[in-house]
Swiss-Prot record:
Its cofactor is Mg(2+). One of its GO terms (biological process) is carbohydrate catabolic process. Pathway: Aromatic compound metabolism; (R)-mandelate degradation; benzoate from (R)-mandelate: step 1/4. This is Mandelate racemase. Its EC number is 5.1.2.2. The gene is mdlA. Pfam families: MR_MLE_C, MR_MLE_N. Divalent metal ions. Magnesium seems to be the preferred ion.
Length: 359
């Protein structure tokens, strides 16, 4: 096979609706501002990926970064690891972090998708693993007692064996009321994860988490500011229940710092922020060496492939950011994600829908 080159990069900014707004203790995400990426190759295949900007304020900047990076990658070989190394070097003075790192991850994910298509194999098999069901939890919001309970019951009826609910209400009693109501509705053999979204200081996090661990929660996620690894370590040291973090690690190097000081007993990198497929591979090796169970954050389509190839795979987060513009090739059965038997990641754009949400 002759060398496959990158021949073009197209980006489209969209702002798509969510089935439920994502309410958190620190704010609400009402829509999903996404950058859709198409990476064309000399083999005739096109790799697809998308990025989540979190806020519409950052959407155009993220798209522009990708557009400006196009000239750096066109006519380069379709070799994701080498592309990542080149971009890391090009941006070392500006700082290979933040939106720059996120944009580079979008290129990486699209390149791996294209590589799978070139070899006519799903990404999971390209990574050397077999496709298998990946256990998933249904990810919810700061919904209040009634809606949180209703959504948990619905998830259980759909076959899920765990849910995550966001907490961080004004009073601890409110956090406990939500967890207790869910527990009463779904029973003891059902996982309940809780997420504070960085909303507490360390003393408050210790106090609330010590109360919550008596309720049998599976983990307590980001109880304090995500960059405060020492604070997380102090919280974890006072608890039996695992602290979960990682969605804001910008690259495996941040994961290494957190794990090295015992900031958490569970890890959940975000496929975008950790550095795409290339960053995830490195992160999964760290998790294996530290003996840390590793879950995913958002990006459920590609994360299913990645977790199936992760030695310490734990849970996939089911939260459908892009369902308005992506065909539902990733399915869920009996609480598990079922990887599609399609080349690459399996992302297929719903082109007729994309036009409705272009920014």
């Amino acid at each position: 096979m002759s060398e496959v080159l990158i021949t073009g990069l197209r980006t489209r900014a969209v702002n798509v609706p969510l089935a439920y707004p994502v309410h958190t203790a620190v704010g609400t995400v009402g829509t999903a501002p996404l950058v859709l990426i198409d990476l064309a190759t000399s083999a005739g295949v096109v790799g697809h990926s998308y990025l989540f900007a979190y806020t519409p304020v950052a959407l155009k900047s993220l798209k522009q970064l990708l557009d400006d990076m196009a000239a750096m990658i066109v006519n380069e070989p379709l070799a994701p690891v080498s592309l990542e190394a080149m971009l890391a070097k090009r941006f070392c003075l500006a700082g290979y972090t933040g939106l720059i790192r996120m944009a580079a991850a979008g290129i990486d994910m699209a390149a791996w998708d294209a590589l799978g298509k070139v070899h006519e194999t799903p990404l999971v098999k390209l990574l050397g693993a077999n496709a298998r069901p990946v256990q998933a939890y249904d990810s919810h919001s700061l919904d209040g007692v009634k809606l949180a309970t209703e959504r948990a019951v619905t998830a259980a009826e759909l076959g899920f064996r765990a849910v995550k609910t966001k907490i961080g209400y004004p009073a601890l009693d409110q956090d406990l009321a939500v967890v207790r109501s869910i527990r009463q509705a779904v029973g003891d053999d059902f996982g309940i994860m809780v997420d504070y979204n960085q909303s507490l200081d360390v003393p408050a996090a210790i106090k609330r988490s010590q109360a919550l661990q008596q309720e049998g929660v599976t983990w307590i996620e980001e109880p304090t500011l995500q960059h405060d690894y020492e604070g997380h370590q102090r919280i974890q040291s006072k608890l039996n229940v695992p602290v979960q973090m990682g969605e804001n690690w910008l690259g495996p190097e941040e994961m290494f710092k957190a794990l090295s000081i015992g900031a958490c007993r569970l890890a959940m990198p975000d496929a975008m922020k950790i550095g795409g497929v290339t960053g995830w591979i490195r992160a999964s090796a760290l998790a294996q060496q530290f003996g840390i169970p590793m879950s995913s954050h958002l990006f459920q389509e590609i994360s299913a492939h990645l977790l199936a190839a992760t030695p310490t795979a734990h849970w996939l987060e089911r939260l459908d950011l892009a369902g308005s513009v992506i065909e539902p090739t990733l399915t869920f059965e009996g609480g598990n994600a079922v990887i599609p038997d399609l080349p690459g990641v399996g992302i297929i754009w719903r082109e007729k829908e994309i036009g409705k949400y272009l920014v």
